[in-house]
Amino acid sequence: TFYTRLLQDPRLTPELCATMRLFVSGSAPMLVDTHTQWQARTGHTILERYGMTETNMNTSNPYDGARRPGTVGMPLPGIELRIMDNAQEVAQGDIGTIEVRGPNVFKGYWKMPEKTAEELRPDGWFITGDLGQIDAEGYVSIVGRGKDLIITGGFNVYPKEVESLIDEIDGVLESAVIGLPHPDFGEAVVAVVVPSDPALTAEVVQAAAAQKLAKFKQPKQILLLSELPRNTMGKVQKKELRNIYATLFT
């Protein structure tokens, strides 16, 4: 969020950032477009990594070496990371739930034994709840949160894929894709879009999505808002959006 907001400021130049040593990102997956724009505007390549309260840092792109846009790098020394689905490790490149194990992982939730048992395996693996995949060279990509996965008509839709496409449309500042209850499909894909151009219409977004997305991935509804709800850390609150629009199709 901070990077996208700074990119909107014309004062952001290579000269302004000349004395900066390093820019990092790790609170939420960064779009490739944001990463690329930042490098072009400032001359700095953002170092993206992946961590959470329960584990501190899990992975990082290298300080010296290739920092790959769209990835959070590789597991840090001493930390194991695997991608799981239905208690089985998935094949390379497949999407599943990220689990981590190492000295960085917490002991459990304070006075919450049930939650601890649900998310921390007896052998030390922590179930992060994040969806991800690992490429052939070991770089990890975050696809989204498991709870944000949309199942529509029996098909899985990963919101980040749809958001990445929508965010590339001219006139779009940012977007959030959610699943809402639907009488026919179980869940319907809905895109909440913040325009950067007041002339942007829902029809333009819908047409662009129809060109590049499979039918089941295309939003059934496009909602235009002036801003997305966020918490104090700047993370988009999709739960709040789901609550606000829960009855959109019912």
Predicted regions and their residues:
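Gly/Ser/Thr-rich phosphate-binding loop
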Residues: 3, 7-68, 80, 87
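Glycine-centered tight turns that cap/initiate beta-strands
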Residues: 11, 19, 43, 78, ...
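Beta-strand->loop->alpha-helix junctions that form or flank phosphate-binding loops
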Residues: 47-54, 73-75, 178-181, 223
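Short Gly/Pro-enriched turn/cap motifs at secondary-structure boundaries
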Residues: 66, 70-76, 120-123
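Conserved ATP/PPi-binding loop(s) of AMP-dependent carboxylate-activating enzymes
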Residues: 74-78, 88-119, 157
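AMP-binding/adenylate-forming catalytic core of the ANL superfamily
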Residues: 102, 107-108, 115-118, 131-217, ...
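Acidic/polar alpha-helix N-cap and adjacent early helical turns
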Residues: 243-250
